[in-house]
A protein has these predicted regions:
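Conserved phosphate/anionic-ligand binding catalytic regions in large, soluble enzymes, centered on
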Residues: 53-64
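Phosphate-handling active-site elements
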Residues: 32-43, 71-89
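Short, hydrophobic/aliphatic alpha-helical segments
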Residues: 3-7, 36-53
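Polybasic, low-complexity association/targeting segments
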Residues: 1-17
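DPxDG-like acidic metal-binding loop motif
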Residues: 63-72
Length: 132
């Protein structure tokens, strides 16, 4: 069996499961990038998919993806302002989300998901690969 693309793993962990979007993103990134992050780390993200669902909140899956980008690009002892690679990747991810979905807000994305019920909507052109 061929290795799944990142978006396919996200769909695998999220569609038809009890996992929140945040947990699905975490599980997919952890597996895809062989991060070997602990169950304790997963628990840190687990409430995001439940508690961020307000009209003003950012998508929890997006938030987890930003955290994973930071994890993969930050250097030991490096401050935020020094991580230009991470900032560039986050800017590209934000541009993709806004261009493809028109929003990063949870409620608006859920409405899109309801409109496309039964279809898998997380399909970035590059398969969601980070090039670190």
């Amino acid at each position: 069996m061929a290795e799944m693309k990142l978006y396919e793993l996200v769909n695998h962990y999220h569609i038809g499961t009890e996992l929140t979007c945040a947990e699905a993103m975490f599980m997919a990134c952890n597996e895809y990038y062989h991060l070997n992050l602990s169950e304790e780390t997963r628990k840190m993200f687990s409430v995001m998919g439940l508690g961020m669902q307000t009209e003003q909140s950012c998508c929890a899956a997006f938030t987890v993806a930003v955290g994973i980008i930071g994890l993969m690009t930050a250097k030991e002892g490096q401050t935020d302002v020094s991580n230009m690679e991470g900032y560039q990747m986050i800017a590209e991810l934000t541009d993709f989300m806004l261009g493809f979905y028109g929003t990063v807000h949870c409620v608006e994305l859920q409405k899109l998901e309801e409109l496309l019920a039964g279809r898998r909507i997380l399909r970035p052109a590059n398969g969601g690969q980070l090039s670190c």
